[in-house]
C-alpha cells in the first residue's frame, strides 16, 4: 500500500514503515507498487526515490516490486533500477487500455525477460484493471519458455487458481475468500490488500512463495 502526503506525493517514510509493519505482524512479504499501491498513478521518479530508501529496510529481501507499466520501455527501465538496488522479484501486470491477446502478452513478457534475464516475475492476472485475462495456455507457454523467470501468478480474475497446475510455480489468489479453497487445490497463498489492515490474523504457512500484503 502506498501512503500519500496531502499534496498527493508519495510519503516514503510512512509507506516503508507500513510495509515493515505488515511483515512484522506476520505476513511473509509486501508488494511495493501493486494495485493498492496505486502503481499506475505514482510518478516513476517517486517510485525510484522510494526504492532507494527501501534498500535500507530491515526486510529488504522480502519485497516484491510492482514494475508493470503501460510502456514496455519504462517497465524494463524500472526493473533495471530495482535490480541495481538489489531487488530481483517483480509483480507485473500486462499493459492496459489497448486490447491484447495471448500472443501479444507472451511477446510483452518475452521482451522483458530477454532484456533482464536474471529476474523472477510473478504475473498479475486482473482483467478488471488491464482488460486482459490470462489463459492457462498463455501461462503454460511463458513458463515453458522461461521456467527460471516466470515463477508465479497473482490471480485476481479467479479463472486460474482452480485449474492451473504447473510444477514449481506459485498460484496466489488475490482475495481471502478464495484462500482456503485455493490451498486445498494446491495454491501457495495469497497476495491481498486486506493484509494491510489485518495482517496478524491472515498470516498463513506451508507456502512456496510468501503470503504478501499488496
Where in the sequence are the language-model features?
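Single conserved hydrophobic/aromatic residue that forms the stacking wall/gate
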Residues: 206-214
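Short glycine-rich loop/turn motifs that provide flexible caps or phosphate-binding loops at active sites
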Residues: 28, 33-36, 65-67, 151, ...
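Active-site beta->alpha loop and helix N-cap motifs at the rims of alpha/beta catalytic domains
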Residues: 3-4, 12-131
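Catalytic alpha/beta core domains of metabolic enzymes, predominantly
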Residues: 129-207
Amino acid at each position: 500500500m502506498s501512503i500519500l502526503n496531502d499534496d498527493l506525493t508519495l510519503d516514503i517514510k510512512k509507506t516503508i514503515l507500513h510495509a515493515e509493519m505488515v511483515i512484522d505482524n506476520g505476513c511473509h512479504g509486501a508488494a511495493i507498487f501493486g494495485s493498492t499501491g496505486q502503481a499506475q498513478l505514482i510518478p516513476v521518479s517517486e517510485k525510484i526515490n522510494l526504492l532507494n530508501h527501501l534498500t535500507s529496510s530491515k526486510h529488504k529481501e522480502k519485497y516484491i516490486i510492482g514494475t508493470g507499466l503501460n510502456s514496455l520501455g519504462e517497465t524494463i527501465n524500472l526493473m533495471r533500477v530495482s535490480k541495481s538496488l538489489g531487488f530481483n522479484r517483480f509483480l507485473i501486470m500486462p499493459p492496459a487500455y489497448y486490447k491484447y491477446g495471448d500472443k501479444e502478452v507472451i511477446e510483452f513478457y518475452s521482451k522483458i525477460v530477454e532484456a533482464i534475464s536474471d529476474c523472477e516475475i510473478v504475473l498479475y492476472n486482473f482483467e478488471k484493471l488491464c482488460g486482459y485475462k490470462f489463459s492457462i495456455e498463455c501461462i503454460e507457454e511463458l513458463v515453458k519458455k522461461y521456467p527460471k523467470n516466470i515463477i508465479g501468478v497473482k490471480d485476481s480474475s479467479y479463472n486460474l487458481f482452480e485449474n492451473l497446475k504447473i510444477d514449481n510455480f506459485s498460484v496466489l489468489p488475490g482475495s481471502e475468500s478464495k484462500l482456503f479453497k485455493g490451498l486445498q487445490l494446491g495454491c501457495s497463498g495469497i497476495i491481498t490488500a486486506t493484509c494491510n489492515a489485518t495482517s496478524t490474523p491472515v498470516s498463513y504457512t506451508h507456502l512456496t512463495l510468501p503470503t504478501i500484503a499488496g
